[in-house]
C-alpha cells in the first residue's frame, strides 16, 4: 500500500531516509562485505559508530559534557528499577509525581527498592484533565530524587514546563517526548527514554545521567543496571543490540542533516497545531485534555461512541492511516505524531476525519 502513515505509539514510524540507508547497507556495511548485525561490537568500525553516535546525540540535544550517555537494554521498565537502585541510597525515599499510567507504573516498581511518596498532580475541571502543580521546592529536598513523566503516552497529557524541585535530583521518563523540542538538560539529574518513538527502533533505552550521580549504586545492584559499571564499559558489559544502536546513529545523522532540534521543534508544533485546531472546531470529535497540557506527540480524541470509534479505526486503516486505536485503558483514538511523522501525514488524517464526520454525524 502506498502513502501509508503509521500513527503507532511505539514502535513508531522511522524516518524514510534512515530506512533506505539501512536497506542499502544491510548486506555490506562499511565495505566489509557483511551486515552491521554480524560485525563484532568491539571491532574498529562499530566502536567508531558508537563514538560518533554519542557525539551526534550530544550535539543534537545540547547535552553538557558532565553527563554520560548510556545505550542500554531493558526499556524504560528496566529503568523503573535501575533508578532507585542507583539513586535511592542516601535518604531512602523518593517522590513520584503522578500524571497517569506510566508515572504510576514507575512508582509501583520503585517501591520494590525504596520508600516512595506518590503525589497525584492532575485534576479534572469541566471535563478536562490538567496538571495543577509544578513547584515542589518546599518538599523535594527530603527525597533522594523526584521522578516524573513529562508526557503520558496513553492519555496525551504533557507537562511543558520543568518542575521546580530546588536542589533535588530531577529524573524524567521522556520515552515519548525526548527530542521533541529543545530542553535545558542541566535541570535534570537523569533523563531516560526508550528509543522506539523518536530515536530509533525498539530494543534500546538511552539514559542521560549526570556524572556526580554515578557510583552510588547499592551493593546488590545487578551490573547490567549499575550506571558506573555501564559507563566504564561504554554501555557494553554484555553484547549490546548492535542493529538498534546502528539505526539510532542513522536517526541522529538524519536529524542533524535536516536542521537539528530547531527544525524538529517547529515541525512538531506545526503538526500538533493543525490537529488540535481541527479538534477545537468540530463537535463530532472530542479531546479531553486542557489546552496547556495537550501532548505535542500523542493526540487523543473520541467520538464518544465505542462502535463509532471502532468504525473510524477500521476505515482509517483501510485508507492507509494505521494504528489509530487508543490504548485499552483509555479508549477512543490516538494519533502519535512523533518526529518522523511528516506534516502530510497529519493533513491526510484531518482530511479523513472530516470525511468520516460528514458521513457519520
From Swiss-Prot:
Subcellular location field: Cytoplasm
Binding site for pyridoxal 5'-phosphate: 76-77, 102, 153, 173, 196, 238-239
SUPFAM superfamilies per UniProt: PLP-dependent transferases
Name of the protein this chain belongs to: Phosphoserine aminotransferase
Enzyme class per UniProt: transferase
Subunit structure: Homodimer.
Protein's job: Catalyzes the reversible conversion of 3-phosphohydroxypyruvate to phosphoserine and of 3-hydroxy-2-oxo-4-phosphonooxybutanoate to phosphohydroxythreonine.
Gene that produces this protein: serC
GO CC list: cytoplasm
Residues that hold L-glutamate according to the record: 42
Necessary cofactors: pyridoxal 5'-phosphate
Superkingdom field: Bacteria
EC number of the protein: 2.6.1.52
A Pfam family this chain is assigned to: Aminotran_5
Catalytic activity: O-phospho-L-serine + 2-oxoglutarate = 3-phosphooxypyruvate + L-glutamate; 4-(phosphooxy)-L-threonine + 2-oxoglutarate = (R)-3-hydroxy-2-oxo-4-phosphooxybutanoate + L-glutamate
InterPro entries: Aminotrans_V_dom (IPR000192), Pser_aminoTfrase (IPR022278), PyrdxlP-dep_Trfase (IPR015424), PyrdxlP-dep_Trfase_major (IPR015421), PyrdxlP-dep_Trfase_small (IPR015422)
A molecular-function term among this protein's GO annotations: pyridoxal phosphate binding
Keywords of this entry: Amino-acid biosynthesis, Aminotransferase, Cytoplasm, Pyridoxal phosphate, Pyridoxine biosynthesis, Serine biosynthesis, Transferase
Cofactor binding: number and manner: Binds 1 pyridoxal phosphate per subunit.
